[in-house]
Every structure is written in C-alpha cells, then in structure tokens.
Amino acid sequence: MLKTINEVFLARDLVRCKSVTPKDDGAINIVAKNLKKLGFKCQFMEFKEKGTPQIRNLYAKIGKASPNFCFAGHTDVVPVGDLKSWTVNPFGGVIKNQKLIGRGVSDMKGSIACFIAAVSEFLKKNKKLNGSISLLITGDEETIAVNGTKKVIEKLIQKKEKINFCIVGEPTNENKLGEMIKIGRRGSITGHLTIIGIQGHVAYPHSSNNPSTIIVEVLNKIKKLKLDKGNKDFEPSNLEITKINIDNTADNVIPAEAKASFNVRFNNLHTSISIKKKLNKIFSSTSKKFKANYKIRYHVSGESFLTKPNKTVYMIKNVIKKSTRINPVLSTTGGTSDARFIKKISPCVEFGLIAKTIHQVDEMARVADLKKLKNIYRDILFNYFK
C-alpha cells in the first residue's frame, strides 16, 4: 500500500541540505527518492555553460497520458548572512514554537515538500491517474539561473514534452497564506552605460570633454522618461539607477570615462527590444550634443508575461479561498522568477508560502501553513483531474 509523505518532515530534511547556489548537498536526491517511492520516473539533467558551475536538475513524471499537471520549484537557497544573528542553526531543520526555521524553508523547500506530500495523498485515493503529474526541480534559481529551469525547458521542448499547466511554488503571500496568486511578471533589463570623454586638467576645461557632466544629463533624462501608465494587469514600468562610477583618484583631473548601471522592470506594453530602442535614442542624442561617444551593454533577465485567467486559474483561486477563507488577488507584482522560462512551454501561475521572512535571518514557515498548503495543492489536483 502506498504510504503518504509528511510535508513537515520532508521540508525539514530538505532544509538540512546546505544547498546554497550552486551547491546541491543532496537536496535533489532527497526529492527524487521520495518521488520514486510514489512511482515517479526521475530524469536527472545536468547543465554547465562556459564559466559557470555545473547544475543538477530533475524532471520527474508519473503517468503517460494527457493532461500533464506540473509543479516547478528550486532547492537552491541564498547564503545565511550573519550566522551569529540566527537563533538556531540555519541548516538544522529546527521546529520551534510550531515553526520550522531554516534557510530556504519558505523560498522554497517548504512548497516542494507540500506538493510531494499532496501528490502522495492524491495518488493514495486515485490509483488510476487520468493524466500525468510532473515536477521540475532545479538547483539554479537564486543567482544567474542559466543552467536550471531555462535549460530544462529547452530540453523538454526539444523532446516535444507536453505540459498543460504548471504551478510554481514561489512564496507569493506577503503576510497570510492565501493572499495572492501570481499570474504574470514584469520583464527585467539591466544596462551598463559608459560615457567616453576627453581627460584633462580641471583648469583647462576647453581642452577636455567631461563625461561626468554628460552622464548626469543622460541619467536625468532616462529617469524622467515616462514609459507608460500601466494597465489593468500590470503596474507602470519603472527605471531605477543602481550604480554611478567615475574612477578618478585626483581632484584636479577631468576623467576620461564615467559609468552607470540601471535596471528597468517593464510590463507587457513593451519588449526588451522596444525598451532598448527608447534608451539608445537618448544615449545617442545626448552624446551627439556633447560630441562624446558612449558604450552600452544590456542584460535581459526575462520578458514580461501574463497568464490570462482561465478555468484552471479560477479553480485554483476557489480552492485557495475555500481553504484559507481569503479571496486571493491575481497579481503581477514582484521580481522575476523561473515562471519566465516555463511560460514558453505551458501556462503557469505561482502560489506558495509566505514571503515575509525569505532571505532573512531566521527564515521560517509555520507548521500549520505547511499543512494548509499541502491540502491546497492536494485539492487542486483533485479538481484538476476530476
């Protein structure tokens, strides 16, 4: 007889893995071991781009028929920070005052444990699965995210694997379980700008071309740029200047270069290409005005995306509302997540634990919330496959 899995004990086992990106420390194996007990076929995928660490990923699946309901998550975690500030061992899996405390418990080992426990309860009552259940688990989400979900999705598309719907276990709730479902995310583009002037003595500015003056004007212009007013699904796009660097050690020298970095979070009224065009126009015109040159380097973390609310989204919303007595908001706020890669193969939403303590000292999840999330995931499966 199939034994069910306890979400708290599994979450505790995962927390005990010191899986700070890019280290795995056995976390993926623990996930696979528990899934194999439930009858899942586990496929490990390892990827390594030049200059990056090798990352182990897992795609596990039970059933061969359609539809395929997928859960996506990551076992890697951020560093613990100041160890002395923690009240417990961050990798001890300590349960104290009905809270499981440890790095990554909310972001997002707890969600992974809850979904696996939910599947175990679902399969115990549904021996004949009318479809497939899969899990996509990566160890590369918290940092550069190049050898994780992105590569797995590319491989699955290449193999013509079909995923009909995916739920990502990100901690979407700010204070209480049930507050928010993410149905999309803004895109993200980072720019590194260099203004090239002419170095000289401050007493002879006519013989120089001060890049500091130019970059100040450029940054003022891009900061004042009104990209849009937002729409019913997204808040307005936003640009923030993150770095200004003038590498000059002398007070009486006009520098040769001035550098700055910025980030744009943009909604679905734009693409990264259209954002680049708007910014490049400002860089070009301002540099021309001052008879200077510029260099710009961009990094696109992801495009904006939106999962239009459909029958499955509303079903998930109703399951959460019934369990928590909170009517969850369908939101597109926040930073980027691996959902930006998953959208290429499947519609997806994000729902998990509470984000209040993630990346902080004494990150924690309430035992009651772990049980409640497990029940939510289980009921989503019952409703999806009925």
Predicted regions and their residues:
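N-terminal helical capping/dimerization or prosegment-like subdomains
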Residues: 1-81, 257-261, 275-278, 367, ...
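Metal-dependent amide/peptide-bond hydrolase catalytic core
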Residues: 2, 29, 172-176, 183, ...
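A structural signal for isolated positions on well-ordered beta-strands in alpha/beta enzyme cores
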Residues: 43, 70, 134-136, 295
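Active-site metal-coordination/substrate-binding segment of hydrolases
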Residues: 68-134, 158-159, 366, 372
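Short beta-strand segments
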Residues: 72-74, 136-138, 166-170, 194-196, ...
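Acidic-glycine-rich active-site phosphate/pyrophosphate-binding loop
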Residues: 80-96, 167, 184-194, 318-319
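Acidic/histidine-rich catalytic neighborhood of metal-dependent amide-processing enzymes
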Residues: 108-184
